[in-house]
A protein has these predicted regions:
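General N-terminal leader/first-domain-start detector
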Residues: 1-2, 148
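Conserved N-terminal glycine/acidic-rich loop preference
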Residues: 31-46, 88-105
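Non-catalytic C-terminal interaction segments of nucleic acid-processing enzymes
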Residues: 96-188
């Protein structure tokens, strides 16, 4: 049976929670000119996950890789079994690769295999990652770090000041904390 994106998502989320413990999953997040299929928030990092099911092609992947590499600390390509052998050719060596396979066609159970572990992305830009945060979340990080609020300045100005002032390792942790605590009900 050929796997589609919808067949992979929920079992993938369970696999990631088993593998990493505390995670927050955000689906379909715009970043640059691409949309991340899945954003996985970890305690000190944010990972981007691109799903290429058996029904997908690699046509847009080149552009997607460039966008993912600007925003995320780690990146994963999750592929259906038809792409498992060729997947390495399409992403940089720091990208992790996970294969999703349906062992028994009679059962909707998937097995996931790590083909390659993700390594820290050398091109990630903390300023790009800060753009994922809402203005209130940025204000909270400013407060935590004793920064002036700059309430009349643009979001880009505030992000630039934060990146200049707060050590990156602290920002990585604080960005994750804000995303873990985000309450989507406040704006629904």
């Amino acid at each position: 049976m050929s796997l589609h994106d919808a067949d992979i998502r929920e079992p993938l989320f369970e696999f990631l929670e088993e593998k990493y413990g505390k995670v927050r999953i955000i689906e379909e997040k715009q970043m640059g000119r691409s949309r991340a299929d899945v954003v996985m928030v970890l305690p000190e990092a944010v990972a981007g996950i691109e799903i290429k099911s058996d029904a997908d092609s690699y046509v847009r992947l080149g552009r997607q890789v460039k966008d993912y590499d600007r925003y995320f600390d780690y990146n994963w390509l999750v592929v259906g079994s038809t792409h498992a052998m060729s997947s390495r050719e399409h992403v940089p060596e720091w990208w992790g690769i996970i294969s999703a396979e349906q062992i028994d066609p009679e059962k909707p159970v998937l097995d996931f295999y790590t083909i390659r572990e993700a390594k820290r992305n050398p091109g990630a830009d903390v300023k790009k990652k800060l753009k994922f945060l809402w203005r209130e979340e940025l204000s909270h990080i400013q407060k935590l770090n004793g920064m002036y609020r700059y309430s009349s300045k643009s979001k880009d100005f505030v992000i630039r000041k934060m990146a200049e002032t707060v050590p990156e390792e602290i920002l990585h942790r604080q960005i994750s904390e804000e995303l873990f605590e985000r309450d989507y009900n406040l704006y629904s």
